[in-house]
């Protein structure tokens, strides 16, 4: 019984999502697919220079993955900083160990050349 509000929330979310998808299909015009210009790529009013589905350099993916990893790790700092006076020395030193491991990972990636753009 304690999970009833979560179940109600999920049911309402599902119903609202289905209603919105249904309304969009109901009011969508099928004539918009008839114009090939609507399906073409748009680059600031110019004709596209190249195919829009070209390959990206792997470095873009590497930098984005590194950003996501370090960004998620930094999100652990906010709750720690807010509750620093309540967690005591154990919480402080455990976060220092966490930051030390984070720093070691950053230095390792730097030394391996993951952050070089050459």
From Swiss-Prot:
Catalytic activities: a ubiquinone + NADH + 5 H(+)(in) = a ubiquinol + NAD(+) + 4 H(+)(out)
Enzyme class: translocase
Keyword line: Electron transport, Membrane, Mitochondrion, NAD, Respiratory chain, Translocase, Transmembrane, Transmembrane helix, Transport, Ubiquinone
Enzyme Commission identifier(s): 7.1.1.2
Cellular compartments annotated: Mitochondrion membrane
Transmembrane region(s): 6-26, 62-82, 87-107
UniProt key word Metal-binding: no
Keyword Electron transport set for record: yes
Main location as per UniProt: mitochondrion
Topological type in the membrane: Multi-pass membrane protein
Listed GO MF terms: NADH dehydrogenase (ubiquinone) activity
Gene Ontology CC: mitochondrial membrane
Family of this protein: Belongs to the complex I subunit 3 family.
Described purpose of this protein according to its UniProt entry: Core subunit of the mitochondrial membrane respiratory chain NADH dehydrogenase (Complex I) that is believed to belong to the minimal assembly required for catalysis. Complex I functions in the transfer of electrons from NADH to the respiratory chain. The immediate electron acceptor for the enzyme is believed to be ubiquinone.
Protein known as: NADH-ubiquinone oxidoreductase chain 3
Organism: Marchantia polymorpha (Common liverwort)
Gene: ND3
């Amino acid at each position: 019984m304690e999970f009833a509000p979560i179940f109600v929330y999920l049911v309402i979310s599902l119903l609202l999502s289905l209603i919105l998808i249904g309304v969009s299909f109901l009011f969508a015009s099928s004539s918009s697919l008839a114009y090939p210009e609507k399906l073409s790529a748009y680059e600031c009013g110019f004709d596209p220079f190249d195919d829009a589905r070209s390959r990206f350099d792997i470095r873009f993916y590497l930098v984005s993955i590194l950003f996501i990893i370090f960004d998620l790790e930094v999100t652990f700092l906010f709750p720690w900083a807010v509750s620093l006076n309540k967690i005591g020395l154990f919480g402080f030193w455990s976060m220092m160990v966490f930051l030390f491991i984070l720093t070691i990972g950053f230095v390792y990636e730097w030394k391996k050349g993951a952050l070089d753009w050459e």
